[in-house]
Amino acid sequence: MEYQTNFLSGEFSPENSSSSSWSSQESFLWEESFLHQSFDQSFLLSSPTDNYCDDFFAFESSIIKEEGKEATVAAEEEEKSYRGVRKRPWGKFAAEIRDSTRKGIRVWLGTFDTAEAAALAYDQAAFALKGSLAVLNFPADVVEESLRKMENVNLNDGESPVIALKRKHSMRNRPRGKKKSSSSSTLTSSPSSSSSYSSSSSSSSLSSRSRKQSVVMTQESNTTLVVLEDLGAEYLEELMRSCS
């Protein structure tokens, strides 16, 4: 009986049971939506795609930097790879070689605009000294052909071929027409200078003469004639006494 009365009482009514089940279901849905939102935010903040993109761009930039460094190093090595060539601080390239006919003394062949031209000058000197046994920068046939095209060069006159090639390169680098123009300018300027000197001296003499004449004329114009009347010897003596 007590169980039936308790079951029929308000504590176990169907309304109370339905309201309690609804409130528990609502709280479960709220917790589920909260967990879903927090999970979405954490996923967006730490997205693996963003990390992958950052890593990819960082890796790509590092590859570009390494390629740039390798290119600069390769360019420097390419400039320094020529035998017997040295780069000058002002951008030119000098060719040098050791002359075996003169006890291995170092001979400066010349200064060139490009490293290739300096390397070819070295190859020409080396080929003239040792022939096919020389270690060259360019193929031997190219160097031999360049020696054949050279004019006014005698490599078999008894002196060192290196000196002959050096003389040829120095004549090539020497500026032309400056000495002749300077000598002609001095020759042409000498008569003009003498004429200018004579004209200046004549003008100075004329000016001095004109100055003297003007001074004499001014002196003559400034002087006036004073005629004294003869007052006798007594008056003259009195004047002399008064002055003394």
UniProtKB/Swiss-Prot annotation:
It holds the Pfam family AP2. Residues 1-22, 166-219 are annotated as: Disordered. GO terms for biological process: ethylene-activated signaling pathway; jasmonic acid and ethylene-dependent systemic resistance; response to ethylene; response to jasmonic acid. Keywords: Activator, DNA-binding, Ethylene signaling pathway, Nucleus, Transcription, Transcription regulation. GO terms for cellular component: nucleus. Gene3D superfamilies: AP2/ERF domain. Residues 8-22, 182-208 have a biased composition (Low complexity). GO terms for molecular function: DNA binding; DNA-binding transcription factor activity. Transmembrane segments: none annotated. Residues 81-139 bind DNA. It is found in: Nucleus. Residues 166-181 have a biased composition (Basic residues). InterPro entries: AP2/ERF_dom, AP2/ERF_dom_sf, DNA-bd_dom_sf, ERF_plant. Probably acts as a transcriptional activator. Binds to the GCC-box pathogenesis-related promoter element. May be involved in the regulation of gene expression by stress factors and by components of stress signal transduction pathways. Acts as an essential integrator of the JA and ethylene signal transduction pathways. Activates the expression of the PDF1.2A gene. Belongs to the AP2/ERF transcription factor family. ERF subfamily. This is Ethylene-responsive transcription factor ERF094.
